């Protein structure tokens, strides 16, 4: 499970709405990170429940490497989508970015469980 930003170690600062509600940059920053991680962990637990495949949760440079120009940077930075997540597929490196056919459907099932859970968690967090 990958969280923005991929271009560096900075944490996302989509704090405008939350800043008005909470009242301080530090509290807001911590709240954003807590919400991101809580939602990501809930999605990750849903992934695991499908086929008991373990995924890690963390920022891209912390888990992989610094990489600019990724879709997470674009969706959060340019489009302002506050819950921007990415996935590294379930293969552990033997096939690169090409999953073997027998891993495609299980990966799709895991990703469906993740996205459904993340959507529910976001609704629970923000819809009265």
What are these regions (language model features)?
Residues 1-128:
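C-terminal accessory segments enriched in acidic
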């Amino acid at each position: 499970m990958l969280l923005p930003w991929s271009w560096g170690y900075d944490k996302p600062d989509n704090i405008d709405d939350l800043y008005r509600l909470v009242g301080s940059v530090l509290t807001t920053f911590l709240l954003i990170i807590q919400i991101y991680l809580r939602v990501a962990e809930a999605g990750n637990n849903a992934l695991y429940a499908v086929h008991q495949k373990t995924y890690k949760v963390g920022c891209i440079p912390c888990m992989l490497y610094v990489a600019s120009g990724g879709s997470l940077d674009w969706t959060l930075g340019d489009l302002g989508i506050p819950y921007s997540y990415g996935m590294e597929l379930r293969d552990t490196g033997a096939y690169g970015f090409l999953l073997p056919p027998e891993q495609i459907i299980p990966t799709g099932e895991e990703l469906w469980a993740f996205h459904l859970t993340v959507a529910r968690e976001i609704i629970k967090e923000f819809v009265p």
